[in-house]
Curated annotation (Swiss-Prot):
Active site: 277
Keywords, ordered alphabetically: Cytoplasm, Decarboxylase, Gluconeogenesis, GTP-binding, Lyase, Manganese, Metal-binding, Nucleotide-binding
Annotated gene: pckG
This protein's name: Phosphoenolpyruvate carboxykinase [GTP]
NCBIfam families on file: PRK04210.1
Biological classification of the source: Bacteria, Pseudomonadati, Pseudomonadota, Betaproteobacteria, Burkholderiales
Listed HAMAP family: PEPCK_GTP
Coiled coil: none
Localisation: Cytoplasm
Biological processes, Gene Ontology terms: cellular response to glucose stimulus; gluconeogenesis; glycerol biosynthetic process from pyruvate; oxaloacetate metabolic process; propionate catabolic process; response to lipid; response to starvation
Sites where the protein binds substrate: 85, 224-226, 275, 400-402
Length: 622
């Protein structure tokens, strides 16, 4: 292929296996704008990964961990100003403001492009531009889509190799004219000739920008996680949700798990929870005592792409894939007791970010073990001891510290996790963290009622005082920070999809709402959670099979005490009543809060939701 020659821009050195002229022209255009010192086309090989990691170790960005403790694993410590997603600097630049809706930040696309062109002009001087091709989902899957990220961060290149199917094989799928989502990322810290780099370059000015109509992502100023690994939330949720709206499918902030009965029948569920509600723990659940022969397997812990198609019997079903190939998990709180499978996944080939370093070259974080080591180097590179922590309250690991680990290493990984066809979804589960009001589990009576439950779900942001409800942050479908278009239109999309499926005679998944976090009068959790959540999962399967009647109440159907399997757990009918009960007064208050959410979204809100609310109110007043 002819190599474009440009003034002051390095040779593109396009590999012969890249046959996509539009892609090459785009790389050339971005290189001309950002002016890197060189362009490197990532091939996704182990050799390339090892070389980039070695270069980052030499630069002080990574520290290699003790191979006897964590084989082929590294620790990165970020700049203290660059530790999390920046929601206030995240923009959806649709042509019309109303298409972004009231829950997203919006700027007119032409104005934003002008801003970005100024910021990106020369932003990669002295650095390498890495061309990172990746498939979200198994290569060639009808549910998968391809992206290419141009980044000046080798940290991004190596993390993308773990988190996605990244490398040369992507170009085989892309061919000469395949579709791809263009993603441009810079840490925003150009280097002058001879200037010494810092271990974690970033810029106080940050922009994470999505152009839904042209399916583009531009990210400036952050090297961290979801701001920089653009396949994750930016593509897999914000851009993909708009693709799903336009093309008739779903991109969801959901785990996917499989449940296999002792008889060998497997069911698949997709579940949405806001942060701090135990999503990864649920995805990797280990069945408790009393469930011999049952098996739970993990397909994904964070994102599901779901498309309708016919099964072998000609029945339309919803099929889901995990578009990712790795876990980008929050480290604190992950330990052998809370998530054995996650800990087993982290034994080798992991990149840790902002956790603490032990004196023998391993990692540690709060919640990993009951007793912390006597001495650590904390996430900011400072000495840390339990005494210092007691005195100052300083954490050894940052609360949002992370691990990037290959999904294939997870002991509970589902044999179908890499199946290009996806798995048929039998049920959707939605849940939040509520100390009162919301029962342990409720099944929606129909699709619209299920969408209503998901649209109004939320989590408490403060610990509720006794007799008071905490402040509830609504997080519809756990998608509030991640929906790439108007949230009210998103509700309408779910309703429309359900309607279309029902009209085609499709088998609709059941919809359940759960809450593991009810508290008693003393403020203690009543439900034991973790592996015991299997008991609720089993009841859902019984409902799918028509084997459990449940009790119908104002808001749907919940289990009777005797319908849950209690073998191996001492949990009384009185305790069960505390987690399943409905308080009419609390629910009147709750419905008032639902009205506030609907008022915020009134402009595009589908009429079916206020109608569902009116039916609930009528039942409540009964």
């Amino acid at each position: 292929m002819n190599q474009p020659v440009m003034q002051g821009v390095p040779a593109l050195n396009v590999p012969a296996y890249v046959k996509h002229a539009r892609l090459v022209a785009w790389v050339s255009e971005i290189a001309a704008l950002t002016k890197p010192e060189r362009v490197v086309w990532c091939d996704g090989s182990q050799e390339e990964y090892d070389r980039l990691c070695a270069e980052m170790v030499a630069a002080g960005t990574l520290k290699q961990l003790n191979p006897a403790k964590r084989k082929n694993s590294y620790l990165a410590l970020s700049d203290p100003s660059d530790v999390a997603r920046v929601e206030d600097r995240t923009f959806i630049c649709s042509q019309k403001q109303e298409d972004a809706g009231p829950t997203n930040n919006w700027t007119a696309p032409a104005e934003m492009r002008q801003t970005l062109n100024g910021l990106f002009d020369g932003c990669m001087r002295g650095r390498t531009l890495y061309v990172v091709p990746f498939s979200m989902g198994p290569l060639g899957s009808p549910i998968a889509h391809i992206g290419v990220e141009l980044s000046d961060s080798p940290y991004v290149a190596v993390n993308m190799r773990i988190m996605t199917r990244m490398g040369r094989a992507v170009y085989d799928v892309l061919g000469a004219d395949g579709e791809f989502v263009p993603c441009v990322h810079t840490v925003g810290k150009p280097l002058a000739a001879g200037e010494q780099d810092v271990p974690w370059p970033c810029n106080p000015t940050k922009y994470i920008v999505h152009f839904p109509e042209t399916r583009e992502i531009w990210s400036f100023g952050s090297g961290y996680g979801g701001n920089a690994l653009l396949g994750k939330k930016c593509f897999a949720l914000r851009i993909a949700s708009t693709m799903g709206r336009d093309q008739g499918w779903l991109a969801e902030h959901m785990l996917i798990l499989g449940v296999t009965s002792p008889e060998g029948k497997t069911y698949h569920v997709a579940a949405a929870f806001p942060s701090a509600c135990g999503k990864t723990n649920f995805a990797m659940l280990i069945p408790p005592a009393g469930f011999d022969g049952w098996k739970v397997t993990t397909i994904g812990d964070d994102i599901a792409w779901i498309k309708p198609r016919q099964d072998a019997n000609g029945q339309t079903r919803l099929y889901a894939i995990n578009p990712e190939a790795g876990f980008f998990g929050v480290a604190p709180g992950t330990g052998e007791k809370t998530n054995f499978n996650a800990m087993a996944t982290l034994k080798e080939n992991v990149i840790f970010t902002n956790v603490a370093l032990t004196d023998d070259g391993d990692v540690w974080w709060e919640g990993m073990t009951d007793t912390p080591p006597a001495h650590l180097t904390d996430w900011q590179g400072q000495d840390w001891t339990p005494a210092i922590a007691k005195e100052t309250g300083r954490k050894a690991a940052h609360p949002n510290s992370r691990f990037t680990a290959p999904a294939a290493q997870c002991p509970s990984i589902d044999p179908e996790w890499d199946n290009p066809a996806g798995v048929a979804i039998d049920a959707f589960i939605f849940g939040g963290r509520r100390s009162t009001t919301v029962p342990l589990v409720t099944e929606a009576r129909d699709w619209t009622e299920g969408v209503y439950m998901a649209a109004t779900m939320g989590s408490e942001t403060t610990a509720a005082a006794v007799g008071q409800q905490g402040v509830v942050r609504r997080d519809p479908f756990a998608m509030l920070p991640f929906c790439g278009y108007n949230m009210a239109d998103y509700f309408a999309h779910w309703l429309k999809l359900g309607d279309q499926l029902a009209k085609s005679g499709a088998e609709l998944p059941k919809i359940f709402c759960v809450n593991w976090f009810r508290k008693d009068e003393q403020g203690r959790f009543v439900w034991p959670g973790f592996g015991e959540n299997m008991r609720v999962l089993k009841w859902m399967i019984d409902r799918i099979e028509g084997q459990a009647r449940g009790d119908e109440h104002v808001f749907g159907v919940s289990p009777r005490y005797e319908e849950l399997r209690w073998d191996g757990l001492d949990f009384s009918a009185e305790q069960f009543a505390k987690v399943i009960s409905l308080d009419a007064q609390a629910w009147q208050q709750e419905l008032t809060l639902h009205a506030e959410l609907f008022a915020q979204l009134a402009h595009h809100l589908p009429q079916a939701l206020p109608e569902a609310k009116a039916r609930l109110e009528a039942r409540l007043q009964g």
